[in-house]
């Protein structure tokens, strides 16, 4: 059974969902899971929102204006989510996969680097600043939380979005950090192009061989709606 669970992962496509119900659902999933619960990946876009990580400082939220600021329990500082950005949450039993937190972070960064390479974009990670960069510009943010040996939260990859709200914050706590996105580097690329590559690259790097793809929606309490 353990061998089968190590191979299996459920990939859920949420489309556009408000941040708070999805965050609640991640917490509920993690609190309720046991050693027989398959790992999951959640793909989602969020309406415009700033999320402040556990290490977040108020001075890095410069001019939020009409965009809400929501406290999150992920690692890191403030970032922005909006339509056209692919958020991928990774809900993984690290003990079962024999993965350390640093190994998971590296796998996520390498997933994004490999995905971008598929579109002829040369990207890299930085030891001093988590995430993925093209030159000096940041293209992907990441932040995780570990509970009961299981991960939740994940990455946010800029694909084809309005980047201007990033000017209202110091992204991830870095004043003057410039952001970029896939569609500025390779015109015409969409989430539909990048999302399958992102998921498949992650599955290959972490070693899942039996993905199951399920569309899913949530109610306002963060519970699954029937198909």
UniProtKB/Swiss-Prot annotation:
Keywords: Acyltransferase, Cytoplasm, Transferase. SUPFAM superfamilies: Class II aaRS and biotin synthetases (SSF55681). GO terms for molecular function: lipoyl(octanoyl) transferase activity. Its main location: cytoplasm. The active site is at 172 (acyl-thioester intermediate). Its EC number is 2.3.1.181. Substrate binds at residues 74-81, 141-143, 154-156. Residues 35-210 form the BPL/LPL catalytic domain. GO terms for biological process: protein modification process. CDD domains: LipB (cd16444). It is found in: Cytoplasm. The keyword Protein biosynthesis does not apply. PROSITE patterns: BPL_LPL_CATALYTIC, LIPB. InterPro entries: aa-tRNA-synth_II/BPL/LPL (IPR045864), BPL_LPL_catalytic (IPR004143), Octanoyltransferase (IPR000544), Octanoyltransferase_CS (IPR020605). The record marks 138 as: Lowers pKa of active site Cys. GO terms for cellular component: cytoplasm. It catalyses: octanoyl-[ACP] + L-lysyl-[protein] = N(6)-octanoyl-L-lysyl-[protein] + holo-[ACP] + H(+). Pathway: Protein modification; protein lipoylation via endogenous pathway; protein N(6)-(lipoyl)lysine from octanoyl-[acyl-carrier-protein]: step 1/2. It is an enzyme of class 2 (transferase). In the reaction, the free carboxyl group of octanoic acid is attached via an amide linkage to the epsilon-amino group of a specific lysine residue of lipoyl domains of lipoate-dependent enzymes. Belongs to the LipB family. Catalyzes the transfer of endogenously produced octanoic acid from octanoyl-acyl-carrier-protein onto the lipoyl domains of lipoate-dependent enzymes. Lipoyl-ACP can also act as a substrate although octanoyl-ACP is likely to be the physiological substrate. This is Octanoyltransferase. It comes from Pectobacterium atrosepticum (strain SCRI 1043 / ATCC BAA-672). The lineage of its organism: Bacteria, Pseudomonadati, Pseudomonadota, Gammaproteobacteria, Enterobacterales.
